[in-house]
Amino acid sequence: NHMGVLGSDNAWWLNVLEHGPASPYADYFDIDWYPLSPQLRGKVLLPVLGDHYGQVLEEGDLKLCFAPEQGEIYIQYLENSFPVDPREYPRILDLRADILRTGLGTEHPDTQELATLSDALRRLPERYSAEAESRAARVRDGTVYRRLLAELCARSPEVTAFLQENIMLFNGHPGDAESFDSLHQLIEAQAYRLAFWRVAADDINYRRFFDINDLAGLRMEDPAVFGDTHRLIFRLLSEGRVNALRIDHPDGLYDPQMYFRRIQAWRDWR
């Protein structure tokens, strides 16, 4: 019925935060992508902040980070990591590009490859594409481009240092509100909206387990969701390593009767 989210270890949820409605897992979670609030259209509200967003931002508690080994850019808040939409990577890759060209040379292969990667990332399909092929291409190609960025950083310490310096420029300086403008604009461009935890009761747009923000509801009535979430369980049953199941909180399911019937027919779902 629900799954732990809001940490940094749920690959499905992180994929949704990265790609929004284009994620192959967007329909796995019970998310209202078109709530009444126009600020949340196509976004997931994340009520994880300990204070109002503006206050947290200007205190420097939201940090833009870069992991060169994975070619990933993300936003860090306490123990939570939030992926950055790969289509927005050029904001960082293109910053001060003239400095890299001056240092390495315009014709240097690393300079040219970074520019090529930035252009490719910029051309990724948007999160809101209605075409299944475009959504799949976005996720697939975004992963490929991140890997290529990681490979470039692995062989070019100059590019790695350049990108890390750009990241530092985004992070601003507490006491200087304008220094956080670029980071704010980047956060606003994501498929999620970071918010004070107290707003969850009124604004949250994903189903939770009771009122626990980090337990997001799953659409277990969807056969694909049921199959993927129960694959390990059914394998353990077939291997004889499990001989009984305890079903907790079935009343929270969309269709409890259907769920029990599928469980009883578990051999058909292996």
Where are these regions (language model features)?
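Structural preference for beta-strand elements that scaffold enzyme active sites
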Residues: 242-246
